[in-house]
């Protein structure tokens, strides 16, 4: 589902607090990763739109301690990233003006029911 950039930037702050993890439990955790399920990503524009600028927010979230995070400051820095996206021809979601880049339409998915069995009635 849709994940606002503010939520991505806030990750992983507090997401695991309710799990009652010990320091030992957290030892194998060395970083964060981002996934994109691509079964409905049919071209490069849709791919870019789905990950940018959220990937920037997640990257900064990974190297910034929770106490140093400031979404307003991040938003200002993100403006430079938008300039770079434009230079590189990346089709991104612009949270400042969502109508600037409309979401590329995905493929039409037609759901088919199970094939009807052929019935042969004999006396």
Task: Give, region by region, the residue ranges found by the protein language model.
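Substrate-binding groove of N-acetylhexosamine-processing glycoside hydrolases
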Residues: 1-123
């Amino acid at each position: 589902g849709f994940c606002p950039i503010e939520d991505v930037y806030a990750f992983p702050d507090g997401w695991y607090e309710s799990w009652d993890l010990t320091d030992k439990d957290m030892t194998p955790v060395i970083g964060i990763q981002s996934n994109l399920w691509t079964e409905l990503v049919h071209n490069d524009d849709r791919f870019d739109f789905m990950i940018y600028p959220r990937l920037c927010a997640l990257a900064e979230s990974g190297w910034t301690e929770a106490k140093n995070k400031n979404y307003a400051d991040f938003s200002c820095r993100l403006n430079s990233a938008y300039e770079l996206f434009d230079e590189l021809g990346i089709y991104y979601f612009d949270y400042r003006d969502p109508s600037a880049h409309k979401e590329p339409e995905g493929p039409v998915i037609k759901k088919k029911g199970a094939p009807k069995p052929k019935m042969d009635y004999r006396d």
